[in-house]
């Protein structure tokens, strides 16, 4: 019997990709309906402290997982508001990647940008929630429940950044 300890280093989104490959149809939520491709290529995107991305493609007996650093690609604005957001973020960061916008910290940047651009003031309740819990989580919660117009606008812009 060997006393060797085996260590495996794994990209976080590679781990997510391997997990996704084991899910069944009932485990997933469809965002946009299309024609099912049982062994089609899959893309996994997740926003957290950064923007994780991995691709899965069918390799005969299962999916091969390909993690990436796609969150570090340059942000490409789609409208005038996103142009202005990009310009405002170039001041502190220089180069602006998608991860600077589509992540927990990115949601805060969008929220601040909208507020500074005359998008209104957050509600007292949202400000209180932001002091008690993770700020991005509070903004998301208030937006999803339509409790704060500025939070709704920020989350809408965040989702636009994901391309959904």
Show where each model-derived region lies.
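Adenine-nucleotide phosphate-binding core of ATP-dependent small-molecule kinases
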Residues: 93-102, 108-109, 113-164
């Amino acid at each position: 019997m060997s006393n060797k300890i085996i260590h495996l280093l794994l990209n976080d989104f590679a781990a997510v990709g391997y997990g996704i490959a084991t899910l069944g149809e009932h485990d997933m939520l469809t965002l946009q309906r299309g024609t099912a491709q049982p062994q089609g290529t899959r893309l996994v995107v997740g926003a957290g402290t950064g923007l994780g991305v991995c691709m899965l493609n069918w390799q005969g007996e299962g999916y091969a997982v390909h993690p990436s650093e796609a969150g570090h690609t340059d942000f490409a604005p789609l409208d005038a508001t996103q142009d202005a957001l990009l310009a405002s973020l170039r001041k502190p960061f220089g180069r602006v990647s998608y991860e600077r916008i589509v992540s927990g910290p990115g949601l805060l940047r969008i929220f601040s940008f909208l507020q500074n651009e005359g998008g209104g003031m957050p509600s007292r309740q949202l400000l209180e929630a932001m002091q008690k819990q993770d700020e991005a989580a509070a903004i998301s919660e208030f937006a999803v429940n339509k409790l704060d117009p500025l939070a709704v606008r920020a989350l809408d812009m965040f989702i636009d950044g994901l391309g959904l």
